Design a protein with these regions (language model features):
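Tryptophan (W) side chains
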Residues: 21-24
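Cationic, low-complexity basic patches in intrinsically disordered or flexible, solvent-exposed regions
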Residues: 12, 40, 58, 72
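Eukaryotic acidic, Ser/Thr-rich intrinsically disordered low-complexity regions
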Residues: 332-366
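Eukaryote-skewed repeat-based solenoidal scaffolds used as protein-protein interaction platforms
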Residues: 94-327
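Compositionally biased, intrinsically disordered low-complexity segments enriched in Pro/Arg/Gln/His
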Residues: 50-53, 60
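N-terminal mitochondrial targeting presequences
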Residues: 41, 61, 65, 74-82, ...
């Protein structure tokens, strides 16, 4: 960890994560990596509370971070840092929209390049694709001495574009990331550029860490705006489409977000819907349907073969608390299928029935 003052890159990280600063951490998700900022903070004021320090550990993306329930929740513990000059520019302001791309991310060259490329009718322009990939390679090479910061910012830019892009128009973005992984950046020593012994861009080093930082939305939040709900759907669609292209025999494949699929399906079909409002249950089921629409084969195959996850991250929902489930399996897949079939036949909302029928058809034919 460096002893240098806060860098622009660290400020970008904190601005990004700081949007939901009072609500961290969320068990089931890894902590945010504001390590440099916190180290600087510790020299300016008494140590921050443990819940904030816990956000700053470097975690492996394959590690589970679940609470005893296995479900994410929002912490209500918060503390003011306004007395610390260096933190004034990093803390969220009340008048800043909760959703959207902040100025720090919008100013990134990678964000500008990618958002320009993805602004299409949903089809991929091959020439523009190669040009964008080359630009990302060049930017990574120029950032060799600060590759960790560069990757963190770049992945935030990628997910920012995903949040703004409807599912039906995400193909260029997914194609871009797949093509990017087929390239390797050469370091100044003539060897492949690496971070944590992972190759840039083949292994997408720390991509999973950034994803987990972002997966902090709560479908039970009745105050969520329409824009926020749309961003949840878009992020879920993006992760699902990546999972559909992942090598599922390799649990470390950076495209494999199957654990997130399980969380979505669990929230929709394994909790007592009577205890949830119609609105929150509707959001949860919509996210589950998005996964079943974009990654039906992956979800089916992992359920048939069996895929357990570390710790309690894959445990069952409250309706099935007595089941010894730690991940995806055939019995659990059957529960999801039965729930969807029931919704498709009994839901009072016509749109819900239609979505459920589409999801049920995906499950029956895969």
């Amino acid at each position: 960890m460096r002893d240098s003052p806060l860098t622009t890159s660290v400020k970008l990280r904190c601005l990004h994560v700081g949007r939901d600063w009072p609500n961290w951490p969320r068990p089931g998700f890894p902590p945010s990596r504001c390590d440099i900022a916190i180290k600087r903070l510790s020299t300016l004021a008494p140590p921050p509370p443990p819940h904030l320090l816990s956000n700053c550990q470097h975690r492996n993306p394959s590690t589970s971070y679940s609470n005893t329930s296995g479900k994410p929740f929002v912490s209500t513990h918060s503390r003011s840092f306004s007395h610390i000059p260096e933190m004034n520019d990093l803390l969220p302001k009340n008048d800043v929209p909760k959703v959207g791309v902040n100025d720090a991310i919008a100013a990134l060259p990678t964000y500008k390049s990618l958002s320009s490329f993805v602004k299409t009718d949903g089809t991929t322009d091959k020439k523009a694709l190669e040009n964008t990939v080359d630009e990302f390679k060049d930017l990574a090479k120029k950032s060799e001495s600060q590759i960790e910061d560069f990757l963190w910012d770049t992945y935030n830019a990628i997910f920012a574009v995903a949040k703004q892009t409807p599912p039906e128009k995400q193909t260029p973005l997914v194609d871009f990331l797949q093509r990017l992984r087929e390239t390797t950046v050469t370091a100044s020593d003539g060897q492949p550029l690496k971070l944590n012994n992972q190759v840039v861009w083949k292994d997408l080093p720390t991509f999973g860490w950034v994803a987990r930082d972002l997966w902090n939305f709560d479908t039970t939040d009745t105050s969520a705006s329409a824009e926020e709900k749309a961003s949840w759907t878009n992020l879920s669609a993006f992760a699902a489409q990546l999972t559909a292209r992942a090598d599922l025999t390799n649990s470390q494949d950076p495209f494999d977000f199957s654990l997130y699929a399980l969380w979505a399906l669990r929230d929709a079909f394994e909790v007592d819907s009577a205890a949830a409002s119609a609105e929150t249950h509707d959001i949860a089921t919509r996210l589950a349907y998005q996964w079943l629409k974009d990654a039906p084969v992956a979800i089916h195959d992992l359920s048939v073969k069996g895929r357990d996850f570390d710790g309690k991250s894959g445990k069952p929902g409250s309706k099935f608390a007595d089941r010894d489930w730690r991940g995806m399996n055939e019995a659990r897949y059957g529960v999801w299928a039965d729930s969807i079939t029931s919704i498709s036949e009994t839901a009072s909302d016509e749109k819900q029935r239609a979505l459920a029928k589409e999801a049920a058809a995906k499950m029956k034919t895969k």
